[in-house]
């Protein structure tokens, strides 16, 4: 087996400790079935189990160390279930060209990338995270996004989550704070964001709904190939401003028309349109209000086909129309950026 073929899978499994088959199947370019079988046969991976997923053996960790990637072997096998969620996020980051291997706050502040919460909890930042549900942090320009993997039965203390995100924003030198909500699909993420109040002693815990609705920046991200493309585009500075002229207009002209949350005038519908590739749902009502105030009878949401299928369930006609952004336009935008994903 060639080192370059082995390294991504070995490094990600060693870093995340446990990766399940569901995650591996969504990124076949990294976790090729033939490769995984060979790694088990050669003693670098333990045989797969439903409880622990894929795990490195001691020889696997030694193989990484010999190639300049020393990673602490697993010490807490009872945490495997939540690690599957953490790994899905980390692998999606990697597939988008965002390094998930930052080993502390100084490296994150200096180099960017994705800082997993499990690194902070294992080292010097446990006091910062406490019992918060955050799974990591990623920087998008001057906005720090606190990454969450919500579940319908998982509750949060809103002020604690806000305080945690704002503290990391200050330490990272970012100017603003937002949230990136991850999951298996847009639908499953959205369902998990619908919560109810629940009294828990003297502290009020509740579902993720208010954390989502109260955020200035909030994005939905599936942990799969589509999510990797979405993240890749989000990393391109001012990607909407660069994409708007390819679709029919410019962001600057929309600002002049007092529609800052719209991105261009759709040439087919002749209506204001908002680019939804980043799945920032919270701004849609603002864009709709601005379009109405400007005298338009509707709003176009421009997205990938898979995103469109989800958005149609939330934003019904006749006010909302939909436009699918062609792959060739996305290719032009990606080729014009400096950020390139490894897979």
Predicted feature locations:
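Hydrophobic residues on short alpha-helical segments
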Residues: 7-13
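Long, compositionally biased intrinsically disordered regions
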Residues: 182-343
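Short acidic, hydrophobic short linear motifs in intrinsically disordered regions
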Residues: 16-28
């Amino acid at each position: 087996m060639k080192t370059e073929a082995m390294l991504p899978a070995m490094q990600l499994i060693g870093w995340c400790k446990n990766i399940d088959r569901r995650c591996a199947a969504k990124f076949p370019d990294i976790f090729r079935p033939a490769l995984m079988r060979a790694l088990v046969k050669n003693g670098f991976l333990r045989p797969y189990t439903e409880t622990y997923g894929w795990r490195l053996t001691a020889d696997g960790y030694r193989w990484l160390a010999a190639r300049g990637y020393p990673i602490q072997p697993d010490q807490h096998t009872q945490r495997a279930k939540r690690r599957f969620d953490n790994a899905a996020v980390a692998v999606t980051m990697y597939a988008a060209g965002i390094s998930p291997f930052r080993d502390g706050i100084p490296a994150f502040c200096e180099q960017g990338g994705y800082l997993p919460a499990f690194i902070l909890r294992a080292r010097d930042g446990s006091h910062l995270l406490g019992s918060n549900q955050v799974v990591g942090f990623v920087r998008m320009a001057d906005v720090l996004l606190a990454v969450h993997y919500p579940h319908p039965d998982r509750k949060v203390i809103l002020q604690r989550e806000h305080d945690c995100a704002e503290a990391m924003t200050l330490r990272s030198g970012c100017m603003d704070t937002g949230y990136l909500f991850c999951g298996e699909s847009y639908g499953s993420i959205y369902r998990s964001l619908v919560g109810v109040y629940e009294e828990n002693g003297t502290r009020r815990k509740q579902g993720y709904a208010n954390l989502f609705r109260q955020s200035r920046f909030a994005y939905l991200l599936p942990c799969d190939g589509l999510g990797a493309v979405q993240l890749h585009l989000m990393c391109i500075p001012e990607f909407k401003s660069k994409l708007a002229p390819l679709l029919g207009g410019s962001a600057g002209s929309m600002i002049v028309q007092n529609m800052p949350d719209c991105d261009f005038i759709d040439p087919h519908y002749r209506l204001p349109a908002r680019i939804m590739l980043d799945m920032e749902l919270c701004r849609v009502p603002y864009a709709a209000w601005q379009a109405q105030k400007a005298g338009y009878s509707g709003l176009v949401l421009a997205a990938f086909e898979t995103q469109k299928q989800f958005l149609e369930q939330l934003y019904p006609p006749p006010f909302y129309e939909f436009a699918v952004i062609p792959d060739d336009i996305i290719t032009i935008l990606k080729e014009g950026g400096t950020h390139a994903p490894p897979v």
